Amino acid sequence: MEFSQLVERLQTHIQCHSLEKFGDRNPTLGGVAALTEALTGQISYVDSAKYAPQMKTTQASALILPPDAKLQAEADAQGIAWCATAQPRLLFAAAIAVFYQPYRPPAGIHATAVIDPSVHCGEDVSIGPHVVIYPNVTLGDRVCIHGNVVIYPGVTIGNDSVLHGNCTIHERTQIGQGCVIHSGAAIGAEGFGFVPTPEGWFKMEQSGQVVLEDGVEIGCNSAVDRPAVGETRIGKNTKLDNMVHVAHGCRIGEACALAGQVGLAGGVTIGNRVILAGQVGVADKSEIGDGAIASAQTGIHGKVGPKEVVCGSPHMPHKLYLKASAIYKRLPEMYDTLKKLKKV
């Protein structure tokens, strides 16, 4: 594919009107690569001036650059074709999609799949080996189910969703369109509901449901539990990394990102476009406002306001955390000083 053809496809793919190709260079491209690993015939990207030194040694034939005159001049000096956009990383992601498409088996049902006669399949559905689908399941058009997936009764899965190998979808679960469930994930399993008694624990049946709205992605070995009553809901385009736990009754808004090993206790409410970094823990019934960010290993108790950035456990504003951390490092010295003052 010629560079000019790729630029045209990228403009169409993400409806970007600010992408421009400059110069007469029009190399043939066959793939994408990181800036330091790219070879002739590959395209890469640069999103800030700190990568300018790497441009001097890259073998990439083309680059996606920001609107930075110095970077663009460096590309010209190196004889590299380039295009400019305000979002180089986004365009690079679109370029990857041009050259690479995830494996998808052809439409059809594998001979070893066990499917109840009551299951409704849309058009061009792909069902892999050893899949088990219980009664009254509805599969939309172009749904792809890889090997060893188990789908419990009454589940609904929307058009173009993909279920990777060895994931399990429990009863009382609705999955929207264009969702991706990765290997080992469990969606709709019973929430952790037990009532203490003199004898131990009385099991509270979990009769609620789980709803994944359109475009949700669930990482490997993650779990989204259903509640005793009501629903656990994950909003449109929200992404969960591997080993994320969403407990019963949580409500997560749209376009959120939860990194690996995040754990939400029951009844947590999260707004839209919230980012939780790795190993963040959120106590039961906590509330997190739109656009909030929690750094890695933050322990959230109570409320986090909209667009607030929090750190530490228990959580505190980012600036306060930095001050507290600086003091914490000096505690031994301060303690020694205090002991000396006591002796005076």
UniProtKB/Swiss-Prot annotation:
Top-level taxon: Bacteria
A Pfam family it matches: Hexapep
BP term (GO), one: lipid A biosynthetic process
Catalysis performed (reactions): a UDP-3-O-[(3R)-3-hydroxyacyl]-alpha-D-glucosamine + a (3R)-hydroxyacyl-[ACP] = a UDP-2-N,3-O-bis[(3R)-3-hydroxyacyl]-alpha-D-glucosamine + holo-[ACP] + H(+)
One term of GO molecular function: N-acyltransferase activity
GO cellular component entries: carboxysome; membrane
Active site, UniProt feature: 248
Keyword ATP-binding: no
EC category name: transferase
EC number: 2.3.1.191
CDD domains xrefs: LbH_LpxD
SUPFAM superfamilies referenced in this protein's UniProt entry, alphabetically: Trimeric LpxA-like enzymes
Pathway named in the protein's UniProt entry: Bacterial outer membrane biogenesis; LPS lipid A biosynthesis
Keywords: Acyltransferase, Lipid A biosynthesis, Lipid biosynthesis, Lipid metabolism, Repeat, Transferase
HAMAP family: LpxD
Subunit structure, as described in the record: Homotrimer.
Family as reported in the entry's similarity comment: Belongs to the transferase hexapeptide repeat family. LpxD subfamily.
Function: Catalyzes the N-acylation of UDP-3-O-acylglucosamine using 3-hydroxyacyl-ACP as the acyl donor. Is involved in the biosynthesis of lipid A, a phosphorylated glycolipid that anchors the lipopolysaccharide to the outer membrane of the cell.
Protein known as: UDP-3-O-acylglucosamine N-acyltransferase
Species this chain originates from: Synechocystis sp. (strain ATCC 27184 / PCC 6803 / Kazusa)
Name of encoding gene: lpxD
